[in-house]
């Protein structure tokens, strides 16, 4: 089992403390396991908690959408608003992020209002 995170639980039986929790064992590449461990450590979490958080972020459940149509409607509404009213250019954001932790850190970029015409 070289390069594989040793599982705490080896079965797929439901946990006793809550009927909605289930132990699940997966095998992942050593490089991914190493990155997962490092990321969890950097966040001050154990690997299980970090992986569960990551899965929540990737799932519809965490975003509050029950279907793809709702997601795309909201995305289109935001896109239409930016096209209509303007927004923050990516280059401004890149410049701001590049200035972090420097002596000349820039303030967050402001939205550019689209000229009416």
UniProtKB/Swiss-Prot annotation:
Keywords: Toxin-antitoxin system. GO terms for biological process: SOS response. Disruption phenotype: Cannot be disrupted, suggesting it is a functional antitoxin. No visible phenotype when the relBE3 operon is deleted. Antitoxin component of a type II toxin-antitoxin (TA) system. Neutralizes the effect of cognate toxin RelE3, but no other RelE or ParE toxin. This is Antitoxin RelB3. The lineage of its organism: Bacteria, Pseudomonadati, Pseudomonadota, Alphaproteobacteria, Caulobacterales.
């Amino acid at each position: 089992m070289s390069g594989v995170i040793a599982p705490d639980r080896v079965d797929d039986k439901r946990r006793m403390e809550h009927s909605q929790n289930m132990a699940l064992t997966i095998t992942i590449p050593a490089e991914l396991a190493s990155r997962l461990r490092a990321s969890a450590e950097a966040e001050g979490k154990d690997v299980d908690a970090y992986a569960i958080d990551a899965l929540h972020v990737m799932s519809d459940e965490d975003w509050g959408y029950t279907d793809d149509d709702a997601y795309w409607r909201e995305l289109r509404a935001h896109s239409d608003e930016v096209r209509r009213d303007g927004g923050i250019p990516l280059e401004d954001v890149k410049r701001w992020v590049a200035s972090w932790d420097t002596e000349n850190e820039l303030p967050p970029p402001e939205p550019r209002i689209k000229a009416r015409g």
